[in-house]
Every structure is written in C-alpha cells, then in structure tokens.
C-alpha cells in the first residue's frame, strides 16, 4: 500500500514538472513560431520532467520522504527513462528533422535518420574508450555503460559553463572593470559615424551620376550580353565615366566601417548606463556581489589546481568539513552531524534551484540567438539533449555535496562508476575554461578603450 502511495506522489510531481516544461516550451521557446511539432514538445517536456524528478529524489533522500525501497525503484525507473530519451529517442529525432529539411532525402528520411542515429551511437560508444569511467566487470549492455558516457559529456558542459561563469560574473557586476566613458567620447564617435555616412551618400551619388551618364551615351544598351558582357560592365568603364567598381569597393568598406562604429557607439551608451546604474543602491549591491564572486573564483581556481596537482578528491562533503574546521578552531561544543545534514539540505536545494533556473535562462537565450522557423525543431531537441545530460551529470557531482549516509542510494543506483574521475575531469575542464575566459576578457577589456578612443 505504501508503494502505491509513494508512486502516486511521484507520478503527480512528474505531471506537474511535465506541465511546467510544456508551458515553458509554449510561452518562451516557441511563442514566436506558428509551426509546432507536438512530438518535439512532448520530448522536451518529458526530458524536463524526468530531469527535475532526479533532483526531487535527492531532496526526498535527505528528508527521508517515501519508503526506501520506493525511492530506489523510482531512482532506477527515472534513470532508465532519461537514458532511453537521451541516447535513443532524442538523437533519432534530431536526425529525422535534419533529413526532413533536405528535399533530396525527403522520401527516404526514415532510412537516413536511422543511419545518422547509428553514426551517433558509434561515436557515442567510442567516447568511453579514452576515459577510465567504468569498473572492468561491467558488461557491454549494462546501464553503467550509458551513464558513464552521458556523464562525461554533461560534466564537460557543466565545467565549461562554470569556468566561464565564475570569471564573467564578477567582470559583469564589478564597477572596477567599467571603462570611464564621457559624453565627449560618445559625441566624438557619433561624429565619426555621421562623417562616414556622409561619405557613403556622396559616393553613391557619384555612382548614380556615372550610371546616368553611361545610359545617356548609350553604353548600357550597346554593351555585349552574356557572361562576357557582365564581366566587362564590372571591370571596364566607359570613356569619361567613373570607375564604378572602385567606387563600389570604397562604399562597401565604408559601410562595414559604419556598422562597426554603430556597434561601438551602442556599446559606449551601454557602458555609460552601467556606470550610472553602478551609482544606485542596487548597483552597489551587485558590485559587492562582484567582489564576493571574485574571491570565490580565485578560491575555486586555486582548489582546482591543487586537486589536479595532488590528484585528490575530497572524501567529506564541504559543509561537514567547513563546520568541523570552524568548531575545532573555536573550541566549542557543537553537533556537527546534526547541523551538517540540515545545512547540506539547504545547500543542495540552492544548487538545484539555481541550476534549473540558470540552465533555463541560458537555453532561452541560446534558442533565440540561433533558431529559425526551419531549424527550431532541431534546436529544441538539441537543448533537450543538453538539458538531460546536464542534469544527469549534476547528480554525479552533487553526490559529493551530500553527507556520506545520503550518498549510498545514489551510488547503488548509478552503479560502480569511477566517481573520482568525474570530479578530477570537472576540475581540469573548469580550470582550462576559467583561465581561457580570464585571458579573453583581459584582451577584450584592454583593446576596448583603444578601439573606442581612436581618432
């Protein structure tokens, strides 16, 4: 009876998650498109529902909600479904919609979709060869084979985003990195833009006058037809007329310059607005957050470097370790185990909420940046694939943030994976991403003033 009640709770929560994913799809991703493929919408919503259910099961594990056997069953069921979606269903439909957009392959789209899926499976399976991600005793058809490979892709994605975010967040929030932009700088750049536009108009007038002169002399009517005529009209000019090709090249160069000047002007206006915003109370608050994240970024890079150099992975969750250090330093009586469980629950909850929110915001921006009416179905399926892999790998990494007694069922469900490898791999990719982001932002910040203030 308890199993039925527990299952009804899980099914109800999954329906709610599915509904939220459906609304997000309709209200955010596809609100500007008339053509909707319901199979894409269902796949996206189901992926979102089962991804959120994994985080729900982590919270239930900490709180002791549901029977232990029920939680284990739903862990297994949820993991099997999400892997079925990520490895079989989503890649197949991505290939199907890609082939459907190619007219030559439209009649044989099912065959070519299967070929694309088999190609994906080959490279997906070969992905596990270079990495020590499995215990040697696992069979080729075991569920651990799929989890391990999905985990590598997801952890790599998480580390790249985390490394860039750890550097970009303080760079964005802190007023220290803002360039000093004045009204004089903006006016000077606008003057250059107006001068460039005047030059473009002047040269286009010269081209129009030259074409009119050629027409009046009968050059247009008498010029040879065909390919040779086209080449001659471009490369040769009538006697007494302007060289239209040369003027057109100058116009193209000036138009490209005008586009750059326009973008630089808009950037200066945005920077000036940020300077004004930084003087407000909310701006000062975000400036403080920027300093906090700067410290966190330096600490994270330092710890990642130490972990890589010493080849170590923490055995104790960060909350318990931090409380133990504080208690030993202050020399006070404190129930470390009791409070570490409650604080870990709050920390895990914050990580889960911020992960879901941050990923949805990123997915929305990414979708609007690259989607079109023809590619939108493929893009949504790619986002569903990224989302599912991201959440599966989050479970792999969030395990270390939990006290040891709560890690047991996750370890049992995920199998005998090499968890230490994933944490070391995350540190390596995070460090590379963070250092690359620092170098990129440094060069961009150093070059920007020179570019804007050039005469």
From Swiss-Prot:
One of its GO terms (biological process) is skin development. The keyword Zinc does not apply. It comes from the Eukaryota. GO terms for molecular function: voltage-gated monoatomic anion channel activity. Glycans are attached at residue 180. It is found in: Golgi apparatus membrane. Keywords: Glycoprotein, Golgi apparatus, Ion channel, Ion transport, Membrane, Protein transport, Transmembrane, Transmembrane helix, Transport, Voltage-gated channel. It holds the Pfam family GPHR_N. The keyword Membrane applies. It catalyses: iodide(out) = iodide(in); chloride(in) = chloride(out); bromide(in) = bromide(out); fluoride(in) = fluoride(out). It is a multi-pass membrane protein. GO terms for cellular component: Golgi cisterna membrane; Golgi membrane; Golgi-associated vesicle membrane; monoatomic ion channel complex. The chain crosses the membrane at residues 5-25, 46-66, 79-99, 114-134, 150-170, 288-308, 343-363, 378-398, 425-445. Homotrimer. Interacts with RABL3; the interaction stabilizes GPR89. Voltage-gated channel that enables the transfer of monoatomic anions such as iodide, chloride, bromide and fluoride which may function in counter-ion conductance and participates in Golgi acidification. Plays a role in lymphocyte development, probably by acting as a RABL3 effector in hematopoietic cells. Belongs to the Golgi pH regulator (TC 1.A.38) family. This is Golgi pH regulator. It comes from Mus musculus. The gene is Gpr89.
